[in-house]
């Protein structure tokens, strides 16, 4: 029997490149409703939107979503997740999946996959997903987060830089991917054991996390194991810019 899990969708109004992003209309529905709809298609026993904005809260209540108004001063999405897990009274061994509020095209199967992976790997406190990198431009793009794992699928590290650096191959040619190096792009969906979240918040950011602007490095810094599996379905890009928004509108608007 698959372990039950809760989905939490953090949704902030403030966005440098796309203010009010969760409320942007996509084919007649606000983006946050699109994300919520996808999450509800998963096997989650509960789907909760976590927001720091009254406008988003009102919109969620309007279309029937369970939503919580959280504190505004959280340092990261995981810190916000810990507040929600605490307020919901989730048990320490419960699993919670963090689905980003700007992923209206997220496949429900990936939500189920990451939750099941964590349940199947008791040595890990976090599970996440990745997919192969096929283009050298993605490898050198700092907005594409790379991940390297050990033989058991546990993360060694994450970086915005090319990871690993193929010294000899790149000395000859940086216009193509080196042969024999399985480069992988991290997909930003996480499953957590609730008991881990309080530790994560109490630790505070580390210098490596700050340098890369990758909060999962805080967990690795403290020796926490992160299980990484290849995604079973393609994860289409989320919405970060007005151009992304128009692309998704075209996809969902038919």
Curated annotation (Swiss-Prot):
Pfam family, one: CTP_transf_3
Catalytic activity: 3-deoxy-alpha-D-manno-oct-2-ulosonate + CTP = CMP-3-deoxy-beta-D-manno-octulosonate + diphosphate
One GO cellular component, as annotated: cytosol
Gene Ontology terms, MF aspect: 3-deoxy-manno-octulosonate cytidylyltransferase activity
InterPro entries membership: Cytidylyl_trans, KdsB, Nucleotide-diphossugar_trans
Function description: Activates KDO (a required 8-carbon sugar) for incorporation into bacterial lipopolysaccharide in Gram-negative bacteria.
Family: Belongs to the KdsB family.
Protein name (database record): 3-deoxy-manno-octulosonate cytidylyltransferase
Organism this protein belongs to: Pseudomonas aeruginosa (strain LESB58)
Gene: kdsB
């Amino acid at each position: 029997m698959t372990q039950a899990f809760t989905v939490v969708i953090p949704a902030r109004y403030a966005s440098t490149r796309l203010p009010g992003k969760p409320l942007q209309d996509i084919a007649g529905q606000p983006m946050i409703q699109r994300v919520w709809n996808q999450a509800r298609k998963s096997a989650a026993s509960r789907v909760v939107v976590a927001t720091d904005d009254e406008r988003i809260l009102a919109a969620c209540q309007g279309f029937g979503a369970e939503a919580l108004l959280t504190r505004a001063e959280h340092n990261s999405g995981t810190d916000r997740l810990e507040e929600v897990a605490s307020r919901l009274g989730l048990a320490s061994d419960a699993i919670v999946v963090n689905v980003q509020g700007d992923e209206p095209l997220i496949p429900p199967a990936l939500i189920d996959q990451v939750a099941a992976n964590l349940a199947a790997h008791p040595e890990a406190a976090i599970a996440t997903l990745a997919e192969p990198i096929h283009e050298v431009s993605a490898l050198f793009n700092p907005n594409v987060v790379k991940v390297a794992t050990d033989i058991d699928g546990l993360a060694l590290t994450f970086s915005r830089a090319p990871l690993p650096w193929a010294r000899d191959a790149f000395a000859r040619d940086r216009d193509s991917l080196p042969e024999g190096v399985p480069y992988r792009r991290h997909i930003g969906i996480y499953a957590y054991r609730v008991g881990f979240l309080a530790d994560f918040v109490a630790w505070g950011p580390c210098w490596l996390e700050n340098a890369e602007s990758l909060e999962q490095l805080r967990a690795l810094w403290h020796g926490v194991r992160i299980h990484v599996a290849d995604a079973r379905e393609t994860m289409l890009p989320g919405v970060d810019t007005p151009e992304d928004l128009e692309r998704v509108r075209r996809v969902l608007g038919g």
